[in-house]
Amino acid sequence: RHGNLFTGFSTEDTPAIVEATKFRQGIVIAQVNEIVDELPRVDIPGDWVDYVIQSPKPFYIEPLFTRDPALITDAQVLKGMMAIKGIYGEYGIKSLNHGIGFDTAAIELLLPTYGEELGLKGKICTNFILNPHPSMIPAIESGWVESIHCFGGELGMDEYVAARSDIFFVGPDGSMRSNRAFSQTAGHYAIDMFIGGTLQIDPYGNSSTATANRVAGFGGAPNMGCDPKGRRHSSEAWLKCGEEYGVKEAMWGPVHRGKRLVVQLAETFREKLAPGFVEELDAFALAKNANL
């Protein structure tokens, strides 16, 4: 009743957006599910909020990261096995971010089975910047994961996350406070690898999820998939990737530095035999048509 807001499990980047708005003389209007006397915790202070409107029904939230394992194809399983053995294991990838598609869901489900067979437990996939994917549960329950910092929540995962405060960032109130701003920062500077599916790749290795008949959201991929130069803490995987960088001497001279490993998963042909590898990305024509 004092205007303080509890955004809870799916806090994401709301406090950062509200703060930026309020401290630039903007107006903040909050639509809330319920007005109460006391909150479990304060995610946004009341003096940053100008108006509060109680909604007649809870705001609709759609599950974004839940993938039905029955829909994972044999090709996606094969790609996952290739990635685990040939990339994760080869480089010793411990800190990473996964995309949200079926390709990485397959990898997550393969960790406690195929990954265990390869003897990689404790050597890879210990620390994630990741939303609470249900497909991570087997790996968490079998002791693969040390920590997961989340951009946001996932419908239906709040109770599981609260029960695993040893893995997720859970507060004294018993619920997680996701933080997209912190996750993007950590994903930009601190992880060894980003891996995710894509729709088109050109001869230069440029990748795009925008095609002539489909523009898919890319989330944090451009951020996670870049190679930041301001890394503060080195790792074996980061240094190994840097050693293999073909133009490192021309770029860096004698400096011994690493490089972000970026992996894009694609099939030679997609649905209706649309090619995954193309001479020119559809994104160029889309950008031209949109006057971008």
Residue ranges and their predicted role:
Residues 1-98, 102-126, 130, 134-292:
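Conserved phosphate- and dinucleotide-binding cores of soluble alpha/beta proteins
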